């Protein structure tokens, strides 16, 4: 099973919000998913616009899940913010 970490769109028209989910590559974008690992609101500035379970993301990456380009950028931003806080 090919697993990807991708965005799942929610919200209103003109006011998008995204859930970061782990899903089978063959499932539709807004279809069934395995696990929700985060949240992204593009209308809110960082760091409030991102919420990510980094432990679960790293688990899925070790299992072979491939993040999309956008999710990969979000993971890098959040991990940079986490290391800056500590």
UniProtKB/Swiss-Prot annotation:
<keyword id="KW-0687">Ribonucleoprotein</keyword>
<dbReference type="GO" id="GO:0005737">
    <property type="term" value="C:cytoplasm"/>
</dbReference>
<dbReference type="Pfam" id="PF00886">
    <property type="entry name" value="Ribosomal_S16"/>
</dbReference>
<dbReference type="InterPro" id="IPR023803">
    <property type="entry name" value="Ribosomal_bS16_dom_sf"/>
</dbReference>
<keyword id="KW-0689">Ribosomal protein</keyword>
<comment type="similarity">
    <text>Belongs to the bacterial ribosomal protein bS16 family.</text>
</comment>
<protein>
    <recommendedName>
        <fullName>Small ribosomal subunit protein bS16</fullName>
    </recommendedName>
</protein>
<dbReference type="InterPro" id="IPR000307">
    <property type="entry name" value="Ribosomal_bS16"/>
</dbReference>
<dbReference type="GO" id="GO:0015935">
    <property type="term" value="C:small ribosomal subunit"/>
</dbReference>
<dbReference type="GO" id="GO:0006412">
    <property type="term" value="P:translation"/>
</dbReference>
<dbReference type="GO" id="GO:0003735">
    <property type="term" value="F:structural constituent of ribosome"/>
</dbReference>
């Amino acid at each position: 099973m090919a697993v990807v970490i991708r965005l799942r769109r929610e919200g209103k028209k003109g006011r998008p919000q995204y859930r970061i989910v782990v899903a089978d590559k063959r499932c539709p974008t807004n279809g069934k998913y395995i696990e929700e690992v985060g949240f992204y609101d593009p209308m809110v500035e960082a760091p409030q616009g991102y919420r990510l379970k980094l432990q679960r993301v790293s688990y899925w990456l070790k299992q072979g899940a491939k993040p999309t380009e956008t999710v990969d950028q979000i993971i890098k931003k959040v991990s940079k913010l986490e290391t800056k806080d500590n």
